[in-house]
Amino acid sequence: MAPSATLPLTTAILAIGRLVAAQQPGTSTPEVHPKLTTYKCTTSGGCVAQDTSVVLDWNYRWMHDANYNSCTVNGGVNTTLCPDEATCGKNCYIEGVDYAASGVTASGSTLTLNQYMPSSSGGYSSVSPRLYLLGPDGEYVMLKLNGQELSFDVDLSALPCGENGSLYLSQMDENGGANQYNTAGANYGSGYCDAQCPVQTWRNGTLNTSGQGFCCNEMDILEGNSRANALTPHSCTATACDSAGCGFNPYGSGYPNYFGPGDTVDTSKTFTIITQFNTDNGSPSGNLVSITRKYRQNGVDIPSAKPGGDTISSCPSASAYGGLATMGKALSSGMVLVFSIWNDNSQYMNWLDSGRAGPCSSTEGNPSNILANNPGTHVVYSNIRWGDIGSTTNSTGGNPPPPPPPASSTTFSTTRRSSTTSSSPSCTQTHWGQCGGIGYTGCKTCTSGTTCQYGNDYYSQCL
């Protein structure tokens, strides 16, 4: 997962033809979604290319009134412009984004995300993008993976200790929570939720006047870097979640030489991750009973870390939330595919790659170290495909995707970073909050570990 954020962006949801005056698209820069080809596969027909793209999260975007006064201040909203949902929807325009400047590039079936980008004032700014898979209709692609599998190629070689390249599923609404006050919806990255129950200014596309967190089922397919990785389901009820989850981490499960540069899964090179959601009757209509992780590299299947297979078949911490059965229902109804890259100013990502979890030292993941030594850190996802179990890596039948470049259960509980919350009443701006810009009157001092980074004349942000 990735934390909530806020960046200046722009417009162009007009093509879906259902806009009214409510969190209206702005006019500064068109919202042009980067095309990302993905593949849907069957055992009988092979893999068929899908017309898909990616969209940057709503919370990264600049929102303003007709006079370019910011609709957000001090991590919340400008109560003059946004005293209630209806008035805010009428007054505020949400802008699109320059995807390249936000660290995002896509070509064919390949998506590259950068943690840092050169700053106009010199040095680098942390951009930490989070994106969602979008269909040609301007709504999120809903992946229904119960009794199915998801495969993708990934290059983690440029992610050092402390970085997290994440690819996961979130049970967001297909339309991004679009409603009468927010017609931008999924086309502008609205409606994010996860098992950390983040508290955001907008909750499922609507002004969050109550300050509630937004919880939903989350399936972390990959959280990792070149030194460690975890596969973790997070089941939820309507108001609470198994935020820690029961993950499978090879290092944390007693296999320290399985995943890393030069190891069994050699992270100095591109490899394929296959995640299978197994049901009791072997079909999408069954109950989810286990989740299995597999790897391929250079076209060869890699043996599992654990002799009985790298499988999660139970999750004690999730029992209060329905366990794997709850996750299976979410996978059956459809979940949104999320891509992100981020690092961690508070815990240095120790829960992922240090101590019991990995070989990194407790301070190696400090973002200041990453920036000093690896300003070009990035992750590359490619050849994303989903469908019948066994179909996504089968080279026979239909039109397969391009080849990748040249049972016992073990679970590993992690302590996750805290979720994004409302800003402090003191005049110190939170991480990701606005800290400057023409007409901005809120707090300009950023919380410890972040600095105020210029985005444009109307928007600067604590990063």
Curated annotation (Swiss-Prot):
GO function terms (MF aspect): cellulase activity; cellulose binding
InterPro entries for this protein: CBD_sf, Cellulose-bd_dom_fun, ConA-like_dom_sf, Glyco_hydro_7, Glyco_hydro_7_sf
Compartment list: Secreted
Span list, region Disordered: 390-429
Catalytic activities: Endohydrolysis of (1->4)-beta-D-glucosidic linkages in cellulose, lichenin and cereal beta-D-glucans
Role description: The biological conversion of cellulose to glucose generally requires three types of hydrolytic enzymes: (1) Endoglucanases which cut internal beta-1,4-glucosidic bonds; (2) Exocellobiohydrolases that cut the disaccharide cellobiose from the non-reducing end of the cellulose polymer chain; (3) Beta-1,4-glucosidases which hydrolyze the cellobiose and other short cello-oligosaccharides to glucose.
Family: Belongs to the glycosyl hydrolase 7 (cellulase C) family.
Designated name of the protein: Endoglucanase EG-1
Source organism (scientific name): Trichoderma longibrachiatum
Lineage: Eukaryota, Fungi, Dikarya, Ascomycota, Pezizomycotina
